[in-house]
Amino acid sequence: MRILLIHSDYLEYEVKDKALKKPEEISENQKKGRLDEVLAVFMSVEKVDEQNPEEIVKKAVKEIEEVVSQVKTNNIFVYPFAHLSSELGSPDVALRILKEIENELKNKGYNVRRAPFGYYKAFKLSCKGHPLAELSRTIVPGEAKKEEEVPEALKKEEELVSYWYILTPEGELVEVDKFDFSGYENLKKFANYEINKSRLVTEEPPHVKIMLEQELVDYEEGSDPGNLRYYPKGRLIKSLLENYVTDKVIEYGAMEVETPIMYDFEHPALEKYLNRFPARQYVVKSGDKRFFLRFAACFGQFLIKKDATISYRHLPLRMYELTRYSFRREKRGELSGLRRLRAFTMPDMHTVAKNLQQAMEEFKKQYKLSMEVLKGVGLTPEDYEVAIRFTEDFWNENKDFIVDLAGIIGKPVLIEMWKQRFFYFILKFEFNFVDNLDKAAALSTVQIDVENSQRFGITYYDEEGQEKYPLLLHCSPSGAIERVMYAILEKQAKIMKKGKKPMYPLWLSPIQVRIIPVSEKYLDYALYIAGKLEGAKIRADVDDRNERLNKKIREAEKEWIPYIIVVGENEKRMGVITVRKREDNKQYEIQVEDLIKEIRQKTEGFPYKPRPLPPLVSMRPKFRG
């Protein structure tokens, strides 16, 4: 549907002749009409609208109401106008849609007139000429449905009654409003955020400014909101994080697989799972079939497991995929930089467990694995808060196990308890980062799933050769890669607030060493040092620009480069280098080999990728501004 909305002093029309063989039947009174102080709504119903007329009506009414509220009038003139489109719908459907729009608006209390359909008409109007006086809209069928179509699980999640507690490492379970949060201010912020359940973003978080200034990540106007572009430095960081988490999970014992990004709505197992998983989906049409873009790797991995022959000897069986991408059509007002996206990269491991005992053993191991993974990216337990969620029955039967989880993290944790189980899991934890706006985002998470082995037909053969349904664990040891980047940047924003220098973890620094010759005379020596560093798998570059030395140092500081080397006559003659360390803001004279040894020791065990930009600073494009 195409709509042209004109705020007018008046609109009047007069029927002249038939435009269709069978136009709408009208009375004598309908051959002329006029409204003053009116929003004139010229409308073309298109062929594509026939796929979903109800949603077209709903969406059109919503758009008209929004404009009416802005121009502050109660008078609306619905005017059929075929000239807005070359792909017109059938007259019968078009008239039905226009009548329904008219009736919907009348039912909402507006003063509505509709010009007759299927006639040539003369009309006059007087556009008011203010900034909102002339607007146009294009409405696509199904668009409103995608926004409003909410899985049953999401509705239930909003209705679910939760009981909130704080659990101490000593095993004391305290109602959240009776807990003394002294010394646990971050936990208090997290508890408030979880209990209030408001995800609306009204202020830009600090990490957004950092990601833009550092030329890491940017918004992409050519895509749907919540889909981002990555510049070379940002892509390097993201790629290293992807490799790091993948290496950790494979080292833990998972088998890596790859699965499709879209799945059939009508697949019986998938259809049932959709109604148990609280997420909004992107919808794709292929011919007459509807598909949804995956929001996790569960679907593909479960379908692989369904077709596999699994013995009790294989258990626990771990399968892993790094999804690039997973998709969730989050509400527009909840999208926020790297924290909440519609397309994201999710490390996703699923484990087949023999029984609850084995599942709980794996759960605890994966809890510890998640702590280890976050430690590697510079996040310690002081940087995140723990939420553990379960039913009252699970708590009564497994108190010691839950208390042990609080003991492992070594601080009080937030408990969400339900009287009965609604979700497919019986136990879940998340490590949550609380940012500078007191918003929380889940990073690592593990769940014990008691439903999906039966739903998908996943079985294993026990010691007697009997086919049994296992339990399943869902684990992301880091959470979405984008959220890890968000947490790293938000942590550095907190450090900056305290007047300290921000830093990337050394292994993630896009440029680890910047070499600055004091003049062009020493450029070759600077390149020689850079070559030695690069040969040792250290990312180094040379600032060869014709700028003042202090300016070059300042700009290297702005890029958070951990080591800055200045070379001149003394360094060349003595064979040493003068290094400024960002970590302690001190200057040292050392041998190149000693610097290589230091950096290699600090980055040992982490993945490496070459420098993402040209070796000479003068050869780099500017990606922003």
UniProtKB/Swiss-Prot annotation:
Protein name, entry field: Threonine--tRNA ligase
Pfam families: HGTP_anticodon, tRNA-synt_2b, tRNA-Thr_ED
Entry domain remark: The N-terminal domain is an archaea-specific tRNA-editing domain that hydrolyzes incorrectly charged L-seryl-tRNA(Thr). Catalysis of tRNA editing is performed by the charged tRNA itself.
Cofactor or coenzyme needed: Zn(2+)
tRNA-binding among keywords: yes
PANTHER family, alphabetized: THREONINE--TRNA LIGASE, CHLOROPLASTIC_MITOCHONDRIAL 2, THREONINE-TRNA LIGASE
Region (Editing domain): 1-147
Renumbered residue ranges of the record's region Catalytic: 206-505
Enzyme class: ligase
Subcellular location: Cytoplasm
UniProt-listed Enzyme Commission number(s): 6.1.1.3
Catalyzed reactions per annotation: tRNA(Thr) + L-threonine + ATP = L-threonyl-tRNA(Thr) + AMP + diphosphate + H(+)
Protein keywords: Aminoacyl-tRNA synthetase, ATP-binding, Cytoplasm, Ligase, Metal-binding, Nucleotide-binding, Protein biosynthesis, RNA-binding, tRNA-binding, Zinc
GO cellular component, one term: cytoplasm
Entry GO MF terms: ATP binding; threonine-tRNA ligase activity; tRNA binding; zinc ion binding
Record's subunit section: Homodimer.
Main location as per UniProt: cytoplasm
Species of the source: Thermococcus sibiricus (strain DSM 12597 / MM 739)
Binding site for Zn(2+): C298, H350, H474
InterPro entries: aa-tRNA-synt_IIb, aa-tRNA-synth_II, aa-tRNA-synth_II/BPL/LPL, Anticodon-bd, Anticodon-bd_dom_sf, DTD-like_sf, Thr-tRNA-ligase_IIa, Threonyl-tRNA_syn_edit_dom_arc
One record GO biological process: threonyl-tRNA aminoacylation
Leader sequence segment: none
Function, as annotated: Catalyzes the attachment of threonine to tRNA(Thr) in a two-step reaction: L-threonine is first activated by ATP to form Thr-AMP and then transferred to the acceptor end of tRNA(Thr). Also edits incorrectly charged L-seryl-tRNA(Thr).
NCBIfam families: PRK03991.1, thrS
